[in-house]
Structure formats: C-alpha cells, structure tokens
C-alpha cells in the first residue's frame, strides 16, 4: 500500500543527477478535513552518464489522494504508471564474432494501475476495506539481424497486452487479544491480446513466422477466510481456506492453509 501524504504541511523535493531527475511533492488538500496528496515522478536515462552510448530509459509516476470523512470512512484515489525502454544496437561488422553480435533489439514495457479504495470502521475492532482497480500492461520486443551480404531481416516481433479489472472486499475483525480474522472476496476480469512472430532459426537468416495470435477474456472469482491465533506467548497459528473459480476452463480449487510460528526468544522465530 502507498503511504498517505502529509496532511499538515507541504513538502517538495527536486533532484537532478547523472541518472536523471526526481520530483516529489506532498501536503494537505484540506487541513480541516485531514485530506492529503502524494506525488512522485522519475525520469531516468543512462545516456546522461554514458555520453549517449547507452539506450536504457525509463520513467514512472505515482500519486495518492486521501480523503477521510467523519461518518463514511476514508476514501483513497491512487495510481501508478511506468514506461521502460531498452535498445541494443548490433556490433560493427568488423567486430562480429557470434550470431548475437549481428542482432539489434528493442524492448518496451508500459504498465498502468489505478483505483479507488474505501476503508470503514464498523466498530473499534472491526473494519471493512473495499477496492476497485484497473491494470494495463503492454510488452513489445522486436529484433533485427544483419546478414553477411549486408541486408537486415526482421527476426522477432512479440507483442503482449493485458488489461484487468479487479474488485476485492474483506472484513477484518479482532475478536479478542488472541484471535483476529480476515474474510473476503475478489472478482477479477481478465483480458488479453497476443501477437507472437519469430524466425524459426536465427542462424539461417530466415524471415519471421506467425507462432501465436489471439485475444480473449475470462474471469476469476475467489473467496477466503484466515485467522491468526495466539496459542501461547511463544506460539502463533495461522489457519485459513481459499476457494477459487476460473471461468476459462470452469475449474474450481480449494486450498486449506495452516502455519505455526514459534518464537522462543525475542527477534528469533521458526
């Protein structure tokens, strides 16, 4: 979980270095209501440190808005984003020793996730936490290979996109000083789009062939209950059960769980 921003005073930071820049800010939205924001952005490229010889670049952004209320609980809006690119060029012809020296490749990754979270205290020992979020990811790898007669052949192009929608909710209840239970559900909508083309044999300089291509969607439903019980001052038990249904193949699974923790002395456990 991302931490909340400072709801009493503003704090800002800006850093510049050989690896890039970093910008951060946090502070109150309303001091009276106790709401706050948190923001961070990073841009990094190794070309600043290597004089332009390297092609590794990435940037990421994160934020969180936190809104506590008097009677309706606490609402949070948050998000994360990442773009990562890595490009490798082929070696000069005079330096070719292996097949890899003739290849150039580029890998680009994009990831986004965001959502809204609500936490509500039913009483001093019980709270309900619910979250609705969405995720998106895109990976692409492309590769070219120079031939001995000076041509360039596209030998790899792999694209994979996924986007999911997730809702989860659980109740956390402390029955007494020795027993705490957490029970909840999760619903996940899955979507995918795959395009996979690659040369059957790089060494023979053959063009790409379609290996796999398709798209689809499915859903995963799950429910769980887990308890942490202090059996004694030195022994703690974790007991739980999870059940899951995968709609794509209509498969049900049930997983019971049991764990024991023994702490003979402070800061040492088995």
Label the predicted regions:
Residues 87, 91-96, 138, 198-199, ...:
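Surface-exposed extracellular loop regions of Gram-negative outer-membrane beta-barrel proteins
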Residues 47-53, 58, 78-99, 269-270:
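Outer-membrane beta-barrel translocator/channel fold
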Residues 66-84, 105-250:
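Face-selective signature of the C-terminal outer-membrane beta-barrel domain
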Residues 20-24, 34-36, 56-62, 109-115, ...:
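Transmembrane beta-barrel architecture of outer membranes
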Residues 55-57, 91-101, 145-154, 198-207, ...:
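Flexible, surface-exposed loop regions and adjacent strand-edge segments
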Residues 1-4, 10-55, 60-68, 76-80:
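Predominantly transmembrane beta-strands of Gram-negative outer membrane beta-barrel pores used
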């Amino acid at each position: 979980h991302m931490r909340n921003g400072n709801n009493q005073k503003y704090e800002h930071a800006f850093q510049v270095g050989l690896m890039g820049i970093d910008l951060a800010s946090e502070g109150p939205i309303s001091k009276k209501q106790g709401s706050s924001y948190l923001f961070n952005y990073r841009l990094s490229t190794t070309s600043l440190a290597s004089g332009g010889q390297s092609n590794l670049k990435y940037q990421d952004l994160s934020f969180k808005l936190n809104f506590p209320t008097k009677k309706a609980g606490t609402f949070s809006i948050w998000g994360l984003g990442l773009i990562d690119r890595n490009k490798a060029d082929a070696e000069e012809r005079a330096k070719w020793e292996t097949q890899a020296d003739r290849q150039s490749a580029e890998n680009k990754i994009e990831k986004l996730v965001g959502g809204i979270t609500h936490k509500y205290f039913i009483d001093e020992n019980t709270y309900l936490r619910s979250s609705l979020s969405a995720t998106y990811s895109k990976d692409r790898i492309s590769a070219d290979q120079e031939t001995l007669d000076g041509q360039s052949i596209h030998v790899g192009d792999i694209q994979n996109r996924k986007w999911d929608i997730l809702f989860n909710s659980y109740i956390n209840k402390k029955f007494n000083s020795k027993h705490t239970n957490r029970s909840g559900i999760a619903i996940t909508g899955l979507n995918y789009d795959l395009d996979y083309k690659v040369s059957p044999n790089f060494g023979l300089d053959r063009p790409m062939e379609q290996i796999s291509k398709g798209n689809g969607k499915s859903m995963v439903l799950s429910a769980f209950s887990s308890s942490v019980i202090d059996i004694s001052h030195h022994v703690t038990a974790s007991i739980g059960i999870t059940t899951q249904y995968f709609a794509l193949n209509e498969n049900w699974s049930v997983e019971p769980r049991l764990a024991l923790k023994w702490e003979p002395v402070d800061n040492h456990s088995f």
